[in-house]
Amino acid sequence: MDSKESLTPGREENPSSVLAQERGNVMDFYKTLRGGATVKVSASSPSLAVASQSDSKQRRLLVDFPKGSVSNAQQPDLSKAVSLSMGLYMGETETKVMGNDLGFPQQGQISLSSGETDLKLLEESIANLNRSTSVPENPKSSASTAVSAAPTEKEFPKTHSDISSEQQHLKGQTGTNGGNVKLYTTDQSTFDILQDLEFSSGSPGKETNESPWRSDLLIDENCLLSPLAGEDDSFLLEGNSNEDCKPLILPDTKPKIKDNGDLVLSSPSNVTLPQVKTEKEDFIELCTPGVIKQEKLGTVYCQAGFPGANIIGNKMSAISVHGVSTSGGQMYHYDMNTASLSQQQDQKPIFNVIPPIPVGSENWNRCQGSGDDNLTSLGTLNFPGRTVFSNGYSSPSMRPDVSSPPSSSSTATTGPPPKLCLVCSDEASGCHYGVLTCGSCKVFFKRAVEGQHNYLCAGRNDCIIDKIRRKNCPACRYRKCLQAGMNLEARKTKKKIKGIQQATTGVSQETPENPANKTIVPATLPQLTPTLVSLLEVIEPEVLYAGYDSSVPDSTWRIMTTLNMLGGRQVIAAVKWAKAIPGFRNLHLDDQMTLLQYSWMFLMAFALGWRSYRQSSANLLCFAPDLIINEQRMTLPCMYDQCKHMLYVSSELHRLQVSYEEYLCMKTLLLLSSVPKDGLKSQELFDEIRMTYIKELGKAIVKREGNSSQNWQRFYQLTKLLDSMHEVVENLLNYCFQTFLDKTMSIEFPEMLAEIITNQIPKYSNGNIKKLLFHQK
């Protein structure tokens, strides 16, 4: 071979560095190096260049030495030393090695021929590099150093070889002695030139096979730990990526107060509060808002500021943020240096970075008193369930030393409970119409009475009347008003009594010396409690329309069919009316059905007589507003005899001038006028109910006449009319049964009326009906 000087390339032709993307790849220090031992170096910083092992061809990899990490002293040419030690002719930088491409050896297969090689220049250059990079100029430049260590003689054995034997070795993978001399130990898969360097005991290399440069975080350039070098070594964590985030323990920085009131913070002045996030392993340490997890550690990072009232006063609460795990979602750990600070999990204060130390000390001196006893009392939080506030009270009522004035609401609660309406249970506004009711029920009752509305319940006359559902059923609401005792006469009586009292007061003031003058009280007062008659007024059915077409010529068949259809609807209304009568539903169900079957014709005929008496003075038969039987229609075949019986009822009502209250009581007694011969299942209750309405009829007579000598006479006349109704109804039923059984007449009957007639015919034919009469014939 030629002289060694011819192998040295120009200094200006050294290639530039390429940033590595992966760790643990085989590296070639210079592109002019085409053979020799291939060295694998674990990446120590992102500035190392690493070659990929994806193909079989050897790739070029360059190492860059930053200016900040190497001294300005002239160093021996490393390329020259490597070239001379390997015995390769490199020539110029563009010179190519002739022959086939060199095979890229796999890991663990590199071997060299035994011998000795002079590596003094390489050792001197690497030693100089070690001395220059052992003490970096600053922490940041030391972290970005390209190569910070070199292999020792113990790890890199000295061998003698020439170019031909070296190339033959790379192709055949055997040495000249026929054996495989391995460059690494058995437990190594790569050749580590930094193995013998000493590292601190806290190095992460303890968990990475004694190599501190195999951490995944050192590959990314943004993950450098250079800002934490030197004085920030206490921030380094020991562990691997599988460990949980551990809280950072820092020296106690609890503020203390001197005797003169000055604040002394024990935290070192050189400890700064970085705003950027710093990654170590798989964890991030930063200051960020979150939910407090109470831990008793003396670190000062951020200040708790609560919106609204100043809950902890103007004092600072020392809270430290430890770590955020980015693997499983955000998870915050905080420390609080005050033992008296209690925080619930659902409270989320907003954290702000504390101001600089001078401002913090000024706030402390301004808000905190002097004395050592104040060191531990930084304020107490008060949340729901907590009762103590030492500072920053949001209201005087929360302070134990400030007595709030007595509340008026406490005295109101000790008074009597609010009065409720007797109708709908709403809050009563006063006594209206003799009953304690609300304003809504007062107006409703007045309109119902003065408007003479005939309400009808769509249910069973037992609807619930309360504040919410009082408008659903006016019939049940009106009935409840009457049951409570509401009466329009109560207001008039109250006015009369008030006027009499005022007149009496004036007389007593004029003649105070006369003790004989006393308050005048009327002898009789109207009854303020609800009566059965008033309830009967409420439940009275409305007048129904027949739907008769008067434009079509009249006929007996057409009129009778229309009357039957109207009668069927009136029977349905009579059933609802009977169930609404007080006491009727207390009877047995079979008794109720029996009474309705026996009395349905009584009710129809008596109501027809009342309408005829009120509208036509007993001259016409007013079945419905659109169906009135006049004298002309009475002349139709089979009509006159039946109309004559019905006109008798209206004429008697007209002769006696029966009042509406008397009519209602008489109509109810007609419902109870016929029973089976064997009696009812609830006979005793039936007799009691019947006697009750007989008394009601007597009360109605007394209310109308007012003279006891005439009351008995009128009672006799009215009861005599009730007894005569049996004969009228018997004649009407005979004709009805005849038309029902005679199919040649083709008179239609509604379904319900046909069912009643079918059940009633056998009973009348067998004589199983007992008439309840007031007078003997």
From Swiss-Prot:
Keyword Lipid metabolism, does the record have it? no
Ranges of Basic and acidic residues compositional bias?
1-14, 152-163
Q: Which keywords annotate this record?
A: Acetylation, Chromatin regulator, Chromosome, Cytoplasm, Cytoskeleton, DNA-binding, Isopeptide bond, Lipid-binding, Metal-binding, Methylation, Mitochondrion, Nucleus, Phosphoprotein, Receptor, Steroid-binding, Transcription, Transcription regulation, Ubl conjugation, Zinc, Zinc-finger
By its UniProt entry, which SUPFAM superfamilies does this protein fall under? Glucocorticoid receptor-like (DNA-binding domain), Nuclear receptor ligand-binding domain
Region Hinge, residue ranges: 487-523
Q: Which residues are annotated with the PTM Omega-N-methylarginine? A: R23
GO biological process entries:
cellular response to glucocorticoid stimulus; cellular response to steroid hormone stimulus; chromatin organization; positive regulation of transcription by RNA polymerase II
Q: How does it assemble?
A: Heteromultimeric cytoplasmic complex with HSP90AA1, HSPA1A/HSPA1B, and FKBP5 or another immunophilin such as PPID, STIP1, or the immunophilin homolog PPP5C. Upon ligand binding FKBP5 dissociates from the complex and FKBP4 takes its place, thereby linking the complex to dynein and mediating transport to the nucleus, where the complex dissociates. Probably forms a complex composed of chaperones HSP90 and HSP70, co-chaperones CDC37, PPP5C, TSC1 and client protein TSC2, CDK4, AKT, RAF1 and NR3C1; this complex does not contain co-chaperones STIP1/HOP and PTGES3/p23. Directly interacts with UNC45A.
Q: Where is the NR LBD domain?
A: 524-758
Q: Which Gene3D superfamilies match?
A: Erythroid Transcription Factor GATA-1, subunit A, Retinoid X Receptor
What does the PTM comment state? Acetylation by CLOCK reduces its binding to glucocorticoid response elements and its transcriptional activity.
Q: Where is this cross-link: Glycyl lysine isopeptide (Lys-Gly) (interchain with G-Cter in SUMO)?
A: K277, K293, K703
Say what the protein does: Receptor for glucocorticoids (GC). Has a dual mode of action: as a transcription factor that binds to glucocorticoid response elements (GRE), both for nuclear and mitochondrial DNA, and as a modulator of other transcription factors. Affects inflammatory responses, cellular proliferation and differentiation in target tissues. Involved in chromatin remodeling. Plays a role in rapid mRNA degradation by binding to the 5' UTR of target mRNAs and interacting with PNRC2 in a ligand-dependent manner which recruits the RNA helicase UPF1 and the mRNA-decapping enzyme DCP1A, leading to RNA decay.
- Ranges for the region named Modulating are 1-420
Name of protein: Glucocorticoid receptor
User: What are the start and end residues of every segment in region (Interaction with CRY1)?
Assistant: 532-697
Localization annotation: Cytoplasm; Nucleus; Mitochondrion; Cytoplasm, Cytoskeleton, Spindle
- Residues the record lists as N6-acetyllysine modifications: K480, K492, K494, K495
Q: Which Gene Ontology MF annotations are present?
A: DNA-binding transcription factor activity; nuclear glucocorticoid receptor activity; nuclear receptor activity; sequence-specific double-stranded DNA binding; steroid binding; steroid hormone binding; zinc ion binding
The record's note on its domains? Composed of three domains: a modulating N-terminal domain, a DNA-binding domain and a C-terminal ligand-binding domain. The ligand-binding domain is required for correct chromosome segregation during mitosis although ligand binding is not required.
Offer a single GO CC term for the protein: mitochondrion
Q: Could you name the domain of life of the organism this protein comes from?
A: Eukaryota
CDD domains named among the record's database cross-references:
NR_DBD_GR_PR, NR_LBD_GR
Q: Region labeled Interaction with CLOCK — which residues?
A: 485-777
Q: Which family does it belong to?
A: Belongs to the nuclear hormone receptor family. NR3 subfamily.
Q: Which residues bind DNA?
A: 421-486
